[in-house]
């Protein structure tokens, strides 16, 4: 029988092609099942393990000598130590080195051949050892020296790291230190060395000639006396005007002018108070009253230039300083003149559009936008009710004029309401007689039904007018709709088309009659 080829014997498909997926055979899937009972049995076995016996064994082994402990775990002490082997190797190398110095090149070549043979033997011996260790792992462990097992070996991890660090230090770029590691550069070692000749002033020379002027020293008088002095300085006499007449609160303000007077009087409170009462303007910067012309010019400049007080002072209010203009502005904003000014300039400038007393600015903004939109929107055209009202007013005027002249347009019938559409029938003009027909015997146009029924044309026209009148009553009148922007809605055009069509029909009826 021919043996099966390698390709057919491979369970995962052909060995030559790598495109096929791995397909396990039936023999491989026979034992491929997961039995949960084995896991449960292993858990039971682990649960039955006695930990007390393990602790006792460990305690017993701790007191045991090292030789007995090694023999207990299968290690023999008859194996020569590795250090002795190392010493022997070193001695052989030294002897070989001495022989190399005395022997010629030929001998060296021979020695090299012998060394090659020895290395081959050693390599073959190592291969035999590795094979035996693979076959029987326990003797390989036993072949190691017990002192080598016990002695902690030096880890080369730190050595490799040190080598890597040495290499990286040579190639690394400069990296600035982190913020928390930075040192505060304070001290003589961090000071700059200024060369001589740059500074214009000498060490004991003053920078400027003028002497300093002391304005206030808080260390001379205690705080209680200073507060009492400020209370006396701010007391009212009743003759104040302008800003000084405004009542102040109970809190104490730092009056710098009063404190400076106290320093000039060598901290004599009575003398400083006397000077303050004698020269009130020096202690209190009184704002002089503005004239009506100055106020009007200031408001006009505020309209034109805004809150640019330098330009306002230069062009409009030259009699006042810029500081006085600023102080007057804040007083003026709290007065009634500002309210009137805001109302007058509401549509001119948006910045004065809001009243100072208004807090809900959004409602005010919406109201103003709606009022502005309604003022810009065109007036709406007359609606259906307005057109009918105007038509009824015109007919009332014509009937009154015809009655005054002795003529009647629509007869002696009652005037229809403004919501009703008036179909126009026959118009018979002539003098009205004194005899009047009762209202119940008259038709919608004010004529007798008996006389009209005799004429076929009149009867036909009246029947058509009654049908049109019923249709108009059944169909509600469409009113014209206008959007908020003042544009006509699309539904309004339909109403005018319908009204025009009705008007044309009525004109045709009158022509036929």
Curated annotation (Swiss-Prot):
GO cellular component: a single term: transcription repressor complex
Ranges of biased composition (kind: Acidic residues): 82-107, 162-174
Biased amino acid composition, Low complexity: 1-16
PROSITE patterns from the UniProt entry: ELM2 (PS51156), SANT (PS51293)
Polar residues: bias regions: 131-146, 483-500
Positions of disulphide bridges: none
Listed GO biological process terms: chromatin remodeling; negative regulation of transcription by RNA polymerase II; regulation of DNA-templated transcription
Location of the region described as Disordered in the Swiss-Prot/TrEMBL record: 1-174, 368-513
Subcellular location(s) per record: Nucleus
Residues in SANT domain copies: 285-337
Main location: nucleus
InterPro entries: ELM2_dom, Homeodomain-like_sf, MIER/MTA, MIER1/3_C, SANT/Myb, SANT_dom
Domain called ELM2: residue spans: 182-280
Domain of life (superkingdom): Eukaryota
UniProt xrefs under SUPFAM superfamilies: Homeodomain-like (SSF46689)
Keyword Glycosyltransferase: no
Pfam families referenced in this protein's UniProt entry, alphabetically: ELM2, MIER1_3_C, Myb_DNA-binding
Listed GO MF terms: histone deacetylase binding; transcription corepressor activity
PANTHER family: MESODERM INDUCTION EARLY RESPONSE PROTEIN 1 (PTHR10865:SF24), METASTASIS-ASSOCIATED PROTEIN AND MESODERM INDUCTION EARLY RESPONSE PROTEIN (PTHR10865)
Function of the protein: Transcriptional repressor regulating the expression of a number of genes. Probably functions through recruitment of histone deacetylases involved in chromatin silencing.
Protein's UniProt name: Mesoderm induction early response protein 1
């Amino acid at each position: 029988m021919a043996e099966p080829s390698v390709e057919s014997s491979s369970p995962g498909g052909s060995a030559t092609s790598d495109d096929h997926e791995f397909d396990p055979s039936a023999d491989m899937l026979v034992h491929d099942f997961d039995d949960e009972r084995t896991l449960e049995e292993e858990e039971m076995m682990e649960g039955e393990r006695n930990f007390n016996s393990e602790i006792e064994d460990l305690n017993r082994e701790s007191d045991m000598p090292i030789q007995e402990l090694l023999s207990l775990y299968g290690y023999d002490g008859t194996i020569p130590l590795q250090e002795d082997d190392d010493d022997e190797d070193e001695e052989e190398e030294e002897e070989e080195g001495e022989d190399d110095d005395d022997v010629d090149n030929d001998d060296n070549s021979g020695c090299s051949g012998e060394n090659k043979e020895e290395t081959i033997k050693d390599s073959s011996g190592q291969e035999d050892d590795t094979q035996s260790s693979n076959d029987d792992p326990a003797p390989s462990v036993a072949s190691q020296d017990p002192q080598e097992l016990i002695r902690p070996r030096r880890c080369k991890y730190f050595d490799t790291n040190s080598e890597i660090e040495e290499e990286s230090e040579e190639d690394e770029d400069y990296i600035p230190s982190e913020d928390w590691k930075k040192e505060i550069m304070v001290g003589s070692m961090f000071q700059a060395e200024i060369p001589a000749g740059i500074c214009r002033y000498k060490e004991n020379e003053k920078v400027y000639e003028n002497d300093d002027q002391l304005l206030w020293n808080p260390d001379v008088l205690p705080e209680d006396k200073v507060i009492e002095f400020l209370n006396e300085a701010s007391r009212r006499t009743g003759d104040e005007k302008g800003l000084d007449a405004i009542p102040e609160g109970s809190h104490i303000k730092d009056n710098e002018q009063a404190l400076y007077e106290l320093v000039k009087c060598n901290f004599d409170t009575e003398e400083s108070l006397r000077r303050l009462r004698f020269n009130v303007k020096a202690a209190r910067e009184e704002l002089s009253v503005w004239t009506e012309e100055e106020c009007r010019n200031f408001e006009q400049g505020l309209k034109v230039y805004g809150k640019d007080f330098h330009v306002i002072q230069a062009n409009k209010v030259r009699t006042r300083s810029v500081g006085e203009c600023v102080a007057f502005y804040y007083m003026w904003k709290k007065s009634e003149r500002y309210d009137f000014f805001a109302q007058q300039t509401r549509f001119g400038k948006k910045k004065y559009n809001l009243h100072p007393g208004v807090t809900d600015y959004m409602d005010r903004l919406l109201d103003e936008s709606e009022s502005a939109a309604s003022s810009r929107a065109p007036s709406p055209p007359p609606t259906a009710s307005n057109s009918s009202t105007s038509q009824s007013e015109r007919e009332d005027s014509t009937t009154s004029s015809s009655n005054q002249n002795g003529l009647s347009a629509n007869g002696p019938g009652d005037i229809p309401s403004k919501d009703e559409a008036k179909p126009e029938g026959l118009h018979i003009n002539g003098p009205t007689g004194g005899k009047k027909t009762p209202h119940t015997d008259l038709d919608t146009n004010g004529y007798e039904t008996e006389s009209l029924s005799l004429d076929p044309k009149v009867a036909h026209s009246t029947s058509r007018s009654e049908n049109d009148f019923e249709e108009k009553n059944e169909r509600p009148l469409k009113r014209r709709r206008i959007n908020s922007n003042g544009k006509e809605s699309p539904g309004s055009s339909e109403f005018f088309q319908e009204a025009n069509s009705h008007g044309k029909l009525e004109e045709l009826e009158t022509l036929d009659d």
